[in-house]
């Protein structure tokens, strides 16, 4: 993509009401535009990152055996009355009437809707286990939306729902999602800590939040420092194997949100292993048994011919919120430092002298070669000053910058910069592609 053809409304300053770094940088880099309290338009740069995060989540859900679908944003109020939750959400739920005066709502979550889908089509235990998921926009009418996409009113979430015949099978499904979440966050360059959490209005007796440590986190969290060094399960994990040992190891260390915190247990840790910090919730998983299947009559015929309510779990990831969380974890004084897996472009190609025949030819050759090799390239061929070009590239945080100037071209070289480390190297043009591909 040529920068002159791309829509990138970069600003020198962030609005004064942007209180945290991620909100400031998302506004400055032209990733989002606020349309109302907690409601944003996703501009091209931000949308590219959003789609890359969405794809990582999709790949890890598929790897764990979940099946993608899509449910609507608008739901019938009668389904929520059936489950008994219509009044539980209070003013946080946006209630709507259609032209026929039927009660509708903009879904804050999807347990009722997916249960209705399930009970319509699944009748026998032979159709189990089943895990269905979607990635869809939600709306919760927060009293005080703040921190940009971290606590907006409209947001993109991945919701998965598992259905099993027995509690034992349902807990196995829970463990699969537990491991899939750790893999997904690891691929995004994040260390996510699973913490026992309150189940809230979703309900159930087992729940974990996945927390990213950050100074601007919304709540206090407490954990054993050893958790920060544990590796993710890995992409070669066999999801059909017994995952109990892995989950037991992860949950054997102390980790809790403020609501579940046990001061005595925390203080029993050696002092140098106690981590008391702020955290950002990026995922939340629940096992809630028959909380929804019983009142909504989501039953299947078991092996003995008896009709039994299915055991359910739900698993959420805040896809749009993850952009803010990644920026909070990956930035410096010059701007964003994107992990390669979620960056909007892989390489920023800077032409220092547009109109110079040798520079133009070298840039065109590199642009074509990188693109052919599958690299996403943002090519800055504008007439802006050198300082402005470098500052803009640092601000938007692409993992690699390649600078082509008249002096280097005469020597057959370009400068390659690693945005994360700041290291710069002069590289022969014919060697540059190999270096970038091996990064």
UniProtKB/Swiss-Prot annotation:
Keywords: Aminoacyl-tRNA synthetase, ATP-binding, Cytoplasm, Ligase, Nucleotide-binding, Protein biosynthesis. Its EC number is 6.1.1.15. It is found in: Cytoplasm. Its main location: cytoplasm. InterPro entries: aa-tRNA-synt_IIb (IPR002314), aa-tRNA-synth_II (IPR006195), aa-tRNA-synth_II/BPL/LPL (IPR045864), Anticodon-bd (IPR004154), Anticodon-bd_dom_sf (IPR036621), Pro-tRNA-ligase_IIa (IPR002316), Pro-tRNA-synth_IIa_bac-type (IPR004500), Pro-tRNA_synthetase (IPR050062). GO terms for molecular function: ATP binding; proline-tRNA ligase activity. It catalyses: tRNA(Pro) + L-proline + ATP = L-prolyl-tRNA(Pro) + AMP + diphosphate. It is an enzyme of class 6 (ligase). CDD domains: ProRS_anticodon_short (cd00861), ProRS_core_prok (cd00779). SUPFAM superfamilies: Class II aaRS ABD-related (SSF52954), Class II aaRS and biotin synthetases (SSF55681). It comes from the Bacteria. The keyword ATP-binding applies. GO terms for cellular component: cytosol. GO terms for biological process: prolyl-tRNA aminoacylation. The keyword Nucleus does not apply. Signal peptide: none annotated. Homodimer. PANTHER family: MITOCHONDRIAL RIBOSOME PROTEIN L39/PROLYL-TRNA LIGASE FAMILY MEMBER, PROLINE--TRNA LIGASE. Belongs to the class-II aminoacyl-tRNA synthetase family. ProS type 2 subfamily. Catalyzes the attachment of proline to tRNA(Pro) in a two-step reaction: proline is first activated by ATP to form Pro-AMP and then transferred to the acceptor end of tRNA(Pro). This is Proline--tRNA ligase.
């Amino acid at each position: 993509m040529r920068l002159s053809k791309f829509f990138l409304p970069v600003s020198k300053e962030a609005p004064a009401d942007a209180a945290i770094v991620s909100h400031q940088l998302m506004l400055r880099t032209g990733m989002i535009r606020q349309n109302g309290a907690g409601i944003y338009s996703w501009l091209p740069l931000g949308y590219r990152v959003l789609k890359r995060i969405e794809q990582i989540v999709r790949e890890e859900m598929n790897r764990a055996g979940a099946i993608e679908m899509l449910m609507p944003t608008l739901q019938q109020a009668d389904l929520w009355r059936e489950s008994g939750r219509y009044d539980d959400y209070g003013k946080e739920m946006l209630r709507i009437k259609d032209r026929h005066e039927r009660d509708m709502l903009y879904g804050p979550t999807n347990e009722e809707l997916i249960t209705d889908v399930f009970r319509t089509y699944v009748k026998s235990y032979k159709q189990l286990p089943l895990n269905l998921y979607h990635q869809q926009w939600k709306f919760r009418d927060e009293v005080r939306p703040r921190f940009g996409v971290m606590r907006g009113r409209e947001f993109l979430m991945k919701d998965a729902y598992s259905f099993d015949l027995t509690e034992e099978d349902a807990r196995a499904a829970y463990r699969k999602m537990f491991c899939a979440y750790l893999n997904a966050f690891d691929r995004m360059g994040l260390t996510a800590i699973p913490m026992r959490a309150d189940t809230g209005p979703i309900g159930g007796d087992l729940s974990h939040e996945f927390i990213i440590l950050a100074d601007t986190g919304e709540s206090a969290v407490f954990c054993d420092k050893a958790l920060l060094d544990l590796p993710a399960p890995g992409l070669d994990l066999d999801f059909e194997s017994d995952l109990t040992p892995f989950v037991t190891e992860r949950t054997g260390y102390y980790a809790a949100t403020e609501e579940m915190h046990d001061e005595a247990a925390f203080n029993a840790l050696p002092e140098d292993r106690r981590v008391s910090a702020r955290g950002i919730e990026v995922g939340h998983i629940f096992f809630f048994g028959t909380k929804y299947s019983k009142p909504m009559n989501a039953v299947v015929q078991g092996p003995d011919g008896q009709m039994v309510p299915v055991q359910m779990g739900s698993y959420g990831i805040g896809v749009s919120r993850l952009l803010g969380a990644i920026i909070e974890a990956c930035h410096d004084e010059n701007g964003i430092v994107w992990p390669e897996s979620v960056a909007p472009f892989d390489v920023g190609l800077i032409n220092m002298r547009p109109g110079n025949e040798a520079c133009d030819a070298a840039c065109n050759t590199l642009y074509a070669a990188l693109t052919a090799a599958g690299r996403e390239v943002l090519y800055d061929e504008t007439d802006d000053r050198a300082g402005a070009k470098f500052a803009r590239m640092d601000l938007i945080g692409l993992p690699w910058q390649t600078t082509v100037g008249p002096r280097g071209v005469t020597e057959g070289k370009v400068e390659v910069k690693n945005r994360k480390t700041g290291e710069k190297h002069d590289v022969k043009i014919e060697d540059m592609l190999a270096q970038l591909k091996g990064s």
